Amino acid sequence: QGIRQENTLLLLSQAGTIRVIPMSDCAVRMICTRSDEQENCKFDQSRKACAVQWTFTDDDQSIFMRLANLTIKIDKKSASISYYKPDGTCLLKERDRDSRTMESFQSYRVEQAGRIEHIQTADGVKTFVKDAVRVPDKQLYHTRMHFEWQDGEALYGLGQHEEGILNLRGHCVYLHQANRKIAIPLLVSSLGYGILMNTASTMIF
């Protein structure tokens, strides 16, 4: 089900909620949450985003959101999302089956620090807290997205890597800060689009 709420498109299903926020006439922000937890998700919505003009249509099979230079198609059966140029050329498509998953887990915080150990590593001396007392903190999620890349498409970005890889297609990349490795969760395609991930966590491509 698609609902226009202020200047966002709210997509509701039994699996979860997706809020689509137009940031410009060719860029959107997607916020995915479980069930009705969307209200607890904070986001900034600038005046520029509020000025973006868009329309949406809803039929038996699909929901379409149309901006001046971007069309988004949501398949009702699979909940997969596709992105198109105004001329109908496909930019990016999620796979039809289990396009995104969210697995909840319990996080913990340190209530009382234990003994401190200083250990020499390849990245220098690291400080580790041993035997700390942990208490439950927040309910967080392991998230996963599945895309169908196009033939001949090259993917670049995700930061500075020690492996010297330019085109990331067919390679596994771990995004974390260590030594000379600098993680930047921005993926750029040779087809002219980009994906910026904002999960405040480590990531595996």
Task: Say what each PLM segment does.
Residues 1-205:
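N-terminal accessory segment at the very beginning of proteins
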